[in-house]
Regions:
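Charged catalytic and DNA/RNA-contacting regions of genome-maintenance
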Residues: 1-241
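A short, hydrophobic C-terminal helix/tail in secreted or cell-surface proteins
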Residues: 242-246
Length: 246
């Protein structure tokens, strides 16, 4: 069963809630908290069942067919998430975001955390290795590369003239994830993803430009405006701990 081929209105309210979370984070495996388990549905269930070697079952959700499902104990999620991250996936954690005693009907749930290869800081992370998240920005026929280790807070910036040198620098960092604007077209991005399992995350150009303007003006960073990949990393790191939506 494919999520894109079904009508959301035909499902139970809880499954509609899951579908809304998945629609907001389509490139992540959604861990949807139900009681003492995180459950995955539809395509995510197929992927998680295969990659985590756990049983694939089904769930009655008001639809004419049972929805593909698999689940893991909530207290053990970090190990399962780390395994998915090591295989190049992203994980979105969905929790209840309101007090059940105050809820009118179904308790509201939303994504409270996103774990990616470049932002994982759980206990399972190898402390002997840097865990670099990199950002690329193209300007005036050159590339600015910013990279940060979110587990230590270290951040660096460099300018590179051509694609091949850029790829070599990223590989030398053993970067787990590269962030760039959606409009950036570089052949090396496919190579980094396909041959080296580096996750490529794209950020919306318009929203980031608005964020750059706010940060540059609000924090008096005008002299650093050509180095905005650093700012893009900060913005995308904030994005990995999303606030509940209204």
């Amino acid at each position: 069963m494919n999520l894109k081929d079904v009508d959301k209105s035909e499902f139970t309210p809880m499954m509609q809630q899951y579908i809304e979370c998945k629609e907001n984070y389509p490139d992540a495996i959604v861990f949807f908290r139900i009681g003492d388990f995180y459950e995955m549905f539809f395509e995510d269930a197929y992927i998680a069942s295969r990659e985590l070697e756990i049983a694939l079952t089904g769930k009655d959700a008001g639809y004419k067919e049972r929805v593909p499902m698999c689940g893991i104990p909530f207290h053990a999620y970090s190990g399962y998430a780390e395994k998915l991250i090591s295989k190049g996936y992203k994980v979105a954690i969905v929790e209840q975001v309101e007090d059940p005693s105050q809820a009118k009907g179904l308790v509201k749930r939303d994504v409270v955390k996103i774990i990616t290869p470049g932002t994982i800081t759980e206990a399972g992370l190898n402390e002997k290795e840097n865990n670099f998240l990199a950002a690329i920005y193209e300007t005036d026929a050159r590339y600015t590369l910013a990279y940060a280790d979110v587990s230590t807070g270290q951040m660096y910036l460099t300018t590179i003239e051509d694609e091949e040198a850029l790829a070599n620098e990223i590989l030398s960092l053993h970067a787990k994830e590269v962030i760039c604007l959606s409009s950036l077209k570089l052949k090396i991005l496919n190579t980094l993803h396909d041959n080296y399992q580096i996750v490529i995350s794209r950020c919306d150009d318009t929203s980031l430009i608005d964020d750059y303007k706010y940060l540059i003006e609000g924090l008096n960073l005008e002299k650093f405006k050509d180095d905005i990949p650093c700012i893009s990393i900060l913005i995308c790191l904030l994005y990995t701990s999303p606030s509940p939506r209204d």
